Amino acid sequence: MATKKERALEVIEEKTALLWPMSDTLWDHPETGFHERYAAELYGKTLEQEGFQVERELAGIPTAFSGTYGQGGPVIGFLGEFDALPGLSQAAGADEKRPVEENGPGHGCGHNLLGVGSLAAAIALKHYLQDSGLPGTVKFFGCPAEEN
């Protein structure tokens, strides 16, 4: 029987086919703060596919959302950033400046990776709660405009 840590890593490995392309897609569709509609929709759909209840437009912000799985305590939250910065457009894999769109936005701080990494942790914890039968709530908070 796998340890808790091994099981979490197994879940993340099982989700690699979902998570890596998601990160690459976010890289290819950079959106600046409060304009991350593509990213918010992608995260929302992915959370729903993974069994989370999604609440959109939190606090009246069109690109803010949360995903919730489970019930009761403890409540464990993960923050997912997904905004890009203006003027940092860059072709994937290029080791010199090569903008996709001159002066366009880009993920200079790696939010395409950070947000998806947080999502991976939330999904792994969800599976742990499912497998163990333990109570608890997993929350994923989609954080728009973190750079603003």
What role is predicted for each listed range?
Residues T3-H107, V116-G136, E147:
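Acidic/His- and Gly-rich active-site-bordering loop/insert found
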Residues C143-A145:
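Short loop/turn motifs enriched for small/polar and acidic residues
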